[in-house]
């Protein structure tokens, strides 16, 4: 039985799951409270404010039902020092420091996997909720000071009237203020709740986040990603050019 471990954050972990699936699955362990150490060890500073204090037992509880819904995950638990691990997914971190490519390809390179894994979905949501055709999540990380013209263009196409927003309440308030979109907010207490809402959508719109990772992993038919602009697109960790359902703006 293979035993995998990861320290987070949420999106990093979600993008590691194609490796777990490709290797036949197994048990998965979350290494808690490592974000500050990771920031200091690999970047010489604390992690960005949105990751500080994360990957605690609260995050584990949030993830648990979603992780166990994946057919290739036989168990999901927290890491302890006595736990034997066969595949340490945190091994990707030294190569990730320079942001050379997307997460999935980097994980594959780390584990010497030559098969292309970054061209297809890898996640399951057991109970998709199809009543929300357009799902939006826009966090406060890696967004421009002023939203680009694509938001206005999508609004002109009528997507606003079909949309709901998922994420934190303060993100929702900021999104409405930034874009002028007036859409309902749907609370999703667990990652599985969030995945079920996203899985039922025809379109996902959002920036770099765990919700975007879910949308890509679930294979939502149309994904509009508001990409970070502080580096070339082809070095963006969430850039998957072989996934034709994803466009970047």
Q: Whereabouts are the PLM-identified features?
A:
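Catalytic machinery of carbohydrate-active enzymes
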Residues: 1-249
């Amino acid at each position: 039985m293979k035993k995998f471990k990861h320290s987070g954050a949420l999106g990093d972990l979600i993008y590691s799951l194609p490796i777990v699936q490709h290797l036949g699955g197994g048990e998965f362990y979350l290494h808690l409270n490592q974000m500050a150490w990771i920031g200091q060890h690999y970047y010489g500073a604390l992690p960005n404010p949105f990751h500080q204090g994360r990957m605690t037992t609260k995050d584990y509880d949030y993830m648990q039902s979603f992780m166990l819904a994946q057919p290739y995950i036989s168990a999901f638990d927290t890491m302890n020092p006595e736990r034997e691990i066969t595949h340490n997914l945190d091994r990707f971190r030294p190569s990730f420091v320079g942001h050379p490519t997307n997460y999935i390809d980097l994980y594959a390179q780390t584990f010497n996997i030559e098969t292309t894994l970054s061209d297809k979905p890898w996640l399951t949501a057991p109970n998709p909720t199809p009543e929300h055709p357009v799902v939006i999540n826009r966090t406060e990380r890696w967004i421009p000071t002023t939203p680009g013209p694509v938001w206005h263009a999508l609004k002109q196409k009528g997507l606003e009237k079909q949309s709901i927003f998922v994420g934190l309440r303060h993100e929702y308030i900021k999104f409405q203020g930034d874009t002028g979109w007036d859409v309902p907010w749907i609370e999703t207490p667990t990652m599985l709740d969030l995945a079920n809402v996203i899985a039922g959508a025809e379109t996902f719109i959002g920036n770099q986040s765990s919700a975007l990772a879910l949308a890509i992993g679930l294979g939502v038919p149309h994904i509009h990603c508001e990409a970070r602009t502080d580096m070339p697109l082809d070095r963006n960790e969430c850039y998957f050019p072989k996934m034709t359902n994803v466009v970047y703006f």
